[in-house]
Amino acid sequence: MTIPAPIPDKAESSLSFTQGLLLGQLSIVILIGAFIKFFIFGDPPSPDVTAALRATERRSRTLAHKRSLLTLRSSTPRRASQPLNRKRSSVLRNPAPLTTNAILSKTYYNVDSHQPESLDWFNVLIAQTIAQFRADAQHDDAILTSLTKVLNGGNRPDFLDEIKVTELSLGEDFPIFSNCRVIPVDEDGMTLGREGGAAGREHGRLQARMDVDLSDFITLAVETKLLLNYPKPLVAVLPVALAVSVVRFSGTLSISFVPGSPLNGSPTTLAFCFLDDYRLDLSIRSLVGSRSRLQDVPKIAQLIEARLHTWFDERCVEPRFQQIELPSLWPRKKNTRGGEDLDTGSDAGGIGRARSRDVERDLREEARKEVEAETGIRVGRSKLGVSLDVPDEGSEDGLRFRRKSKGRDEYAMPGSMPGLSMT
């Protein structure tokens, strides 16, 4: 005789399952709330703390690069390369090679005792250049078109819709350069101090360093849409508007000339970069959503600011630098401008006469092209057997006399200025 198994209490089991379900849902809600509060809406660190952390990171990266260069030099000693001696002209004199010490001696510049110089004249030139650039941008959409093409280039991810520029402000102030000094560096850009001696400066180059400070409000505002394409395309669309403003930039600009090599045909270049002690303060505003909008999300601002600093560091912060190829500075006729057929004391009137002569020359060139075109048509007709006695439509006596004047027969040029005789 078997004893039946006891029937479990259904009420107790169902109650425990409900409690577990509620507890799991509550834990998920708590985790989501904590994530939103502390990760998205959490207070960002102060700008001073963030700038100090970034400066420390950049400084450690620069020191690591210098240590790697020193280690490489000590492990693999350099051998002086002896280039092939090319045959030199006997006409050109062979002066002594200009080393760094020779240049400093001939210019009476002592890098150890010379005081830093102000750059007031340079600030004026830079201000005029920037002012002209801003004035051109007000009357031309070239900068707006270029920005739109760059933002919507091939690197735009698939989850972003078309990016539209909604605001562009180029600022009102100008950068101030000051405290310029010249220091000798080696071919890798490392500073040659006094311990390097005169021998260490023979094969190096000179580098100019100047402080830069800009306090302005340069703004670029864009708007786009985040496209959620999973599990199927365009499941959700989230409008996003961003405005990034450069509030202040301060740092040290380093400029040096890298001489070219006549052996391999490399040109002379201008190399510039910023030292790792710079500071870039940004103001980032954001607006997410269409109806219930989230304004100025701190985490979005932190991500964009970190991305912009990384972009700047990877391009023009030491040890990385930018190189610009310099054109030839030898005076050439094709580069000559101004002073054509003008008297010494002429001013606006002379310039106006020069411009009128340019217009007259353009009109003559245009008329010459039309005459050549009609001559080609007449030659083609003669080859086809068409009678040349029949004048063309719109012509009366031939190519030379296109229209008859009222008083006398003279050569009238199409498009010429009234009263201009071309006899």
Curated annotation (Swiss-Prot):
Alphabetical keyword list: Endoplasmic reticulum, Lipid transport, Lipid-binding, Membrane, Transmembrane, Transmembrane helix, Transport
Lumenal-side positions: 1-20
Major site of localization recorded for this protein: endoplasmic reticulum
InterPro entries, per database record: Mmm1 (IPR027537), MMM1_dom (IPR019411), SMP_LBD (IPR031468)
Keyword Transport: yes
Region entry Disordered, spans: 332-372, 387-423
Gene Ontology, cellular component aspect: endoplasmic reticulum membrane; ERMES complex
Source organism superkingdom: Eukaryota
Ranges annotated as spanning the membrane: 21-41
Binding partners and assembly: Homodimer. Component of the ER-mitochondria encounter structure (ERMES) or MDM complex, composed of MMM1, MDM10, MDM12 and MDM34. A MMM1 homodimer associates with one molecule of MDM12 on each side in a pairwise head-to-tail manner, and the SMP-LTD domains of MMM1 and MDM12 generate a continuous hydrophobic tunnel for phospholipid trafficking.
Family: Belongs to the MMM1 family.
Descriptive protein name: Maintenance of mitochondrial morphology protein 1
Organism: Botryotinia fuckeliana (strain B05.10)
Gene responsible for this protein: MMM1
